[in-house]
Amino acid sequence: VMNARNSLIVAGLAVSEAAFTMVSPQVVCERKVADGQAVKAGTPLLVISGPTQAILTAERVALNFIQRLSGVATLTGRYVETVLGTGAKILDTRKTTPGLRRLEKYAVTCGGGTNHRIGLYDMVLIKDNHLAALAGEKPNPIAAAVQRARAKYPALKVEVEADTLDQARQAAEAGADYVLLDNMKPEQLREAVQLIAG
């Protein structure tokens, strides 16, 4: 029996089961909970039966998946709970563990979060290095970058990374679909959100 050691939000049951059944199709896993479910310490997650050697061979890999993905889901759930009632959404990052992107992004959704981008192909993200290349453009580099992105990729959403309140304002005025507020203190974040919301 695989039990939760702490209170957590479950994620990764299917991939954990796959670790067992890839070692031996004779291993049978019975789910006792569902991904996305909040459980208390001691709650049974999976009941595993089959050849002992196969179970012990796959056990560590299966546990690693459950631990990692449930950790992501649980932390996401805490953030989601913190912003409950504010209208804010918790979005994940594209900066994931190599080879685990889809699984970690799935775990974010188990915790109540929203996937931001899967890769570089599904949204235009205008960052500081792009803006530096457009220094001197009129009316400002952000407006120029948003305009160029919309012309070249009309079907994609455009996001602008803003390090300052002025950049956040310019991004909103330029019609960016999203403004990513980077490295701002909580009081700056509040002001930027009010500024962007109009």
Which residues make up each language-model segment?
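Acidic/glycine-rich phosphate/pyrophosphate-binding loops and surrounding catalytic core
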Residues: 1-159, 163-174, 178, 190-195
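Short secondary-structure boundary segments
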Residues: 183
